[in-house]
């Protein structure tokens, strides 16, 4: 294990944390960065465990709100409806993810060119939706009905295609269904909790025979980097979106996708 491997692990962890909760596709960024850095994950352990760092970041930021919702559930119909809405939104991705896991991981994830193209297409879609004169009917995530949440959950299934972005798909779906930008991003945070935990557990189970902690230092570096950078994003994203919208992320996707295509054609 050399200094170059540690630097690569640090960069990939930072990329995971910074991109996991914004609509630019963390999967695309981590896969493309790993490809061009020539980083070889120890088994599949590194890729699986750095996700846990990002998961813990969002759980920490929203810990008090999660506790308050849990405490209110026995007496508050609003709290119970919100929990139901999150679970209903999670269901489509849970079913499709479990059924198509092997195909997604072994076929779609091995196609960098596809990832770049999807990044660009998704960027233009996000840009178009961000500029639409939408009139939001829902501005508080606690008021999202389960029927709305289910539709958002269907959009989340699009994120099975690498480069789409889980948060991007849910945010676009929420905006088209009548939410405002801030609450769309916040609901995406809450939906990320069961979705990412479920994906983590499934990945861990599927890769149980390949897991290796031989390079535990690399895993630790990536994990901590993902956790710290994830904290920064979760704490600042809602205010950023309220001020700037999603256009900066859309242009970022387009630029990174285009640069990735050029690099793949030139370098391979």
UniProtKB/Swiss-Prot annotation:
The chain crosses the membrane at residues 5-25, 43-63, 84-104, 107-127, 184-204, 218-238, 247-267. GO terms for biological process: cell wall organization; peptidoglycan biosynthetic process; regulation of cell shape; response to antibiotic. It is found in: Cell inner membrane. It is a multi-pass membrane protein. Its EC number is 3.6.1.27. Its main location: membrane. It comes from the Bacteria. Bacitracin is thought to be involved in the inhibition of peptidoglycan synthesis by sequestering undecaprenyl diphosphate, thereby reducing the pool of lipid carrier available. This is Undecaprenyl-diphosphatase 1.
């Amino acid at each position: 294990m050399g200094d170059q491997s540690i630097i690569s692990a640090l960069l990939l962890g930072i990329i995971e944390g910074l991109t996991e909760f914004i609509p630019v596709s963390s999967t695309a960024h981590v896969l493309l960065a790993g490809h061009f850095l020539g980083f070889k994950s120890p088994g599949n352990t590194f890729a699986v465990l750095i996700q846990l760092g990002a998961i813990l970041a969002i759980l920490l930021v929203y810990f008090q709100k999660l506790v308050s919702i849990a405490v209110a559930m026995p007496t508050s119909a609003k709290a119970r409806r919100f929990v139901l809405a999150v679970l209903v939104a999670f269901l489509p991705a849970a079913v499709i993810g479990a059924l198509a896991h092997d195909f997604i991981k072994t076929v779609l994830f091995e196609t960098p060119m596809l990832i770049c193209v999807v990044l660009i297409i998704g960027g233009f879609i996000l840009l178009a939706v961000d500029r639409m004169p939408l009139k939001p009917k829902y501005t508080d995530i606690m008021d999202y009905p389960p029927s709305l949440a289910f539709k958002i959950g269907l959009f989340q299934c699009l994120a099975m295609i690498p480069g789409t972005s889980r948060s991007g798909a849910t945010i676009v779906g929420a905006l088209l269904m009548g939410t405002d930008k801030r609450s769309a991003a916040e609901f995406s945070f809450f939906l990320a909790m069961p979705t990412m935990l479920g994906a983590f557990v499934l990945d861990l189970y599927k890769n149980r025979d390949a897991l290796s902690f031989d390079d535990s230092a690399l895993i630790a570096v990536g994990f901590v980097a993902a956790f710290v950078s994830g904290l920064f994003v979760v704490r600042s994203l809602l205010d950023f979106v309220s001020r700037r919208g999603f256009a900066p992320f859309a242009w970022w996707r387009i630029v990174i996708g285009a640069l990735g295509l050029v690099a793949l054609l030139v370098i391979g």
